[in-house]
Amino acid sequence: MPELPEVEVSRLGISPHLVGGTIQSLVLRTPKLRWPIPQELKQLEGQTILAIHRRAKYLIIETAVGSAIVHLGMSGSLRILDGDFPAAKHDHVDLVMTSGKRLRYNDPRRFGAWLWCAPDESHEVLGRLGPEPLTEAFNAEYMMDKARNKRIAVKAFIMDNAAVVGVGNIYANESLFTSRLHPLRPAHSLSLEEWQTLVANIKQVLQVAIKQGGTTLKDFTQSDGKPGYFAQELQVYGKAKQPCPHCGEPLCEQKIAQRNTFFCPQCQH
């Protein structure tokens, strides 16, 4: 599943080709992804793309008449093409520019979304979201206050979009390992110093992942079709029973909040 770094990598990859350009047409090859594709998106035709933002794992393609909100779901990807190449089986949406370039959306599992948001309105999918993890609003004091009286596992807590957005499963595992924190620790039990360490490591892990082009485990590719290379940096994710890089103890795997969790029983407390 594309997480925040993969979505940010996609934004950085497509923006130079699209922002400031004019949309010639919108090609819809399916009426429905996770939700029905709204016909209001056709209003994009003839409009100039003013900016492409990211909020959590949503991309927002902004024009004067409204915005397209794009979510990659479990297996979605965006590519920039330099012409009208034949559509493959799972190519569901094309945003065709007057320059001849086109943004193509591919999604084998169809859990992604293309939505519409009118100007000066906020779509419901963007409501009740916590701060962005790479901003100053995400800090140790905020997280300690947010975790007060929260007995859920710290891993589940940092993956809750109401607390902080975009800390997906891969990066939660890696950040907790780097911080030497056990993923099952109750969120309220972390000290301010431990929150300072964890917040700093979440920021660092996400920044490195973005720099490396994200993590390609199966479906994700960058906008130029290349894979993300952060998979080569993973220390614990997907490495159950392999030796811990710090102490050599076999790494454990356990389900926490229905997500595969990897940790060292010796190093993480």
From Swiss-Prot:
Binds 1 zinc ion per subunit. One of its GO terms (molecular function) is 8-oxo-7,8-dihydroguanine DNA N-glycosylase activity. A zinc finger (FPG-type) spans 235-269. One of its GO terms (biological process) is base-excision repair. DNA binds at residues 90, 109, 150. Its EC number is 3.2.2.23, 4.2.99.18. Its cofactor is Zn(2+). Gene3D superfamilies: 1.10.8.50, MutM-like, N-terminal. Monomer. Belongs to the FPG family. This is Formamidopyrimidine-DNA glycosylase. It comes from Vibrio cholerae serotype O1 (strain ATCC 39315 / El Tor Inaba N16961).
